Every structure is written in C-alpha cells, then in structure tokens.
Amino acid sequence: MTDTLFADVSEYQVPVNNSYPYRVLSIRVCDGTYRDRNFAHNYRWMRSAFDSGRLTFGIVYTYARPNWWANANTVRSMIDAAGGLHPRVALMLDVESGGNPPGDGSSWINRLYWNLADYAGSPVRIIGYANAYDFFNMWRVRPAGLRVIGAGYGSNPNLPGQVAHQYTDGSGYSPNLPQGAPPFGRCDMNSANGLTPQQFAAACGVTTTGGPLMALTDEEQTELLTKVREIWDQLRGPNGAGWPQLGQNEQGQDLTPVDAIAVIKNDVAAMLAE
C-alpha cells in the first residue's frame, strides 16, 4: 500500500532546503496575525520545488484565531507578497484550543474558512487540522465535505473527512515511522495513508496533472477560451452550421468561409480554363 509521508514545519525548525526528501510539505504562514519568520523563505522554496518537479503538493497553514478577519488578511497578504497562491497549494486551518477561548469556536472558525475559500477560489482547497478533542469541541459545526488532517500521537483518530494522520511530534510516537526529516531534524510528521502524493493533492482540491494550462491564471484561461470560441464562430458560423450570407450548397446547408473560398477557387479555375 502506498502512503505519502510529509513534514509539518514553522519557524521552530530551520528553513527548508533541497535535502528535504518527500513529495509533500506543510509550512506555517502565521499564527493569527503573528507572521512566521521562515514563511517567505519556505514558500519561495516550495514554489521553486513545484516548478522543478521536486515537490508535488504543498500545504500552507495558519493557526486559527478568533480575530478571523485580521487572521485571514494576514494569510492573504503574506502569500501575495511571496508570489501569490500557487495552484499546487491547499490552505489549512490549524484548529487547536491552546491560547483560544474555550467552547465552540465554529462561528469564527467558519468565517475564517469561507474567507480563505473565497481567496483560494474553491472551498475544497481549504482543509482542517485538529486532534479529536478540539475537532469535536471547538469545531462542532463544520463545512460540508471538509477534509482533515487528524492529529493523534500513538493512535489514529480517524476523524470524519480525514485524509492524513499526524502521527508524531518527533518525540518517538509510532517508532516504526520517521520521526522527522532533513533538514529539520525531529518535527511533526504526517502520513496520508493509502494515497499517492497526487491522490492526496486531489483529495485536498489540488490538481497536479500539469499541462500547458497550469501556467495560466484563471483569467488567462477564460480569455483563451473566449478567443477560441470566437475563432470557431468565425470559421464555422453560429453553432458550427455555416453562414447564411455566404450562400448554400446543393443540400441547402449554409456555407462556411472555407466552403465559400472553395467555391470561389473553383469559379476562378473555370474562368481561367475558358
């Protein structure tokens, strides 16, 4: 069975470099409005690793805080300043009780979720992270279809919508699995059990099939589609059925510009043959 292993890092670890061995990486952008000091470097490396083929999929996460509007703006501004949201990246809400108000935080967590879903262009590119206690107590009302990385050291919480398991903080839990990764040393480690990197990415709303359109923004793809349709209409006529002003063939069908040019060619050839 294929499992996808990956590290989860922040400014508490050294910045990433090309010694990192896995196809997926998760990096912190901020804790509420606190800006992670390693994010700019880590995100530049991540973007470059996508382009070089070293990395398949990336997660950028924020520790979720009740000042959700300022939290969301911090995420947006930091990513935009570092080159913008790459199409191979999903955003993750790190939902933990530490330093947050007790009880149900669904209201502000979901506001943060939907704000970032608007930024990412689709809610499927927003995933969650939590242990079982915080998942069921802090985030009691959750968006439909939410994908989750479940934290459980020593056991798998198997949360609803779970696509990966954070199995250790690097201190020895699940000793048969890696307790860290270069260049970070010991750190939080995760496993998307039974999923290839591409399948894990797809589960988090990210397409990794590549192709020339991956280099285009959504606006550029829309522009390209519009122009292709305009060319089609000019060459084939409305609904591809020809242009009535060019005349009809023997079957009464409207001619396309190519048909009309062929008629002119034949007429000219006949005139020259006389």
Swiss-Prot record:
Domain of life of the organism encoding this protein:
Bacteria
Upper classification of the source organism reads: Bacteria, Bacillati, Actinomycetota, Actinomycetes, Mycobacteriales
Per its UniProt record, what Gene3D superfamilies does this chain match?
Glycosidases
What is the protein named? Uncharacterized protein Rv3766
Concerning InterPro entries, the annotation shows: Glycoside_hydrolase_SF
Organism, scientific name:
Mycobacterium tuberculosis (strain ATCC 25618 / H37Rv)
